[in-house]
């Protein structure tokens, strides 16, 4: 934050600061930029297609990116991560995908994953 956003967030600072993205389909950071600036910008980017390594790249200062609260809370508390907009957040829909098979075991597992995921994310 000190290096890339010393004057705060703006279209200019966001256009220069490197983004960490999961892959070429990851539009979460672009969605955040759009909400902040209302313009389309194309900053430099690094693709890190691993959840743990994605977070590590942000902690190492390779760039900025959006992390779930559960994944970022410890780093924020320890001072290794900083919130760019502490009073604002973005919600991202999550999907549980499975084979389209009739299976009581998969049906039960899907229900458990949905219930536990919802409880964990709304806590």
Residue locations for each model-derived region?
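Short helix-loop capping/hinge motifs at secondary-structure junctions, enriched
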Residues: 1-10, 27, 101-107
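A late-sequence structural motif
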Residues: 86-123
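Small-molecule pocket liners
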Residues: 1-3, 17, 92-96
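Short secondary-structure boundary/capping segments
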Residues: 10-12, 36-38, 73, 86
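Structural signal for conserved beta-strand scaffold positions within catalytic alpha/beta enzyme cores
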Residues: 21, 47, 83-85, 98
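Secondary-structure junction motif
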Residues: 16-38
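Hydrophobic hinge/microswitch elements
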Residues: 39-83
């Amino acid at each position: 934050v000190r290096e890339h956003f010393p004057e705060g967030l703006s279209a200019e600072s966001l256009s220069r600061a490197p983004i960490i993205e999961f892959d070429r389909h990851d539009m979460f950071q672009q969605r955040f930029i759009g909400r902040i600036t209302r313009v389309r910008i194309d900053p430099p980017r690094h693709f890190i297609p691993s959840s743990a390594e994605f977070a590590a790249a942000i902690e190492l200062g390779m760039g900025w990116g959006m992390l779930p609260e559960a994944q970022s809370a410890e780093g924020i508390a320890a001072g290794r991560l900083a919130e760019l907009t502490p009073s604002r957040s973005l919600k991202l829909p999550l999907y549980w995908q499975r084979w389209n098979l009739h299976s009581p075991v998969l049906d039960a597992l899907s229900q458990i994953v949905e219930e536990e995921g919802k409880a964990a994310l709304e806590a």
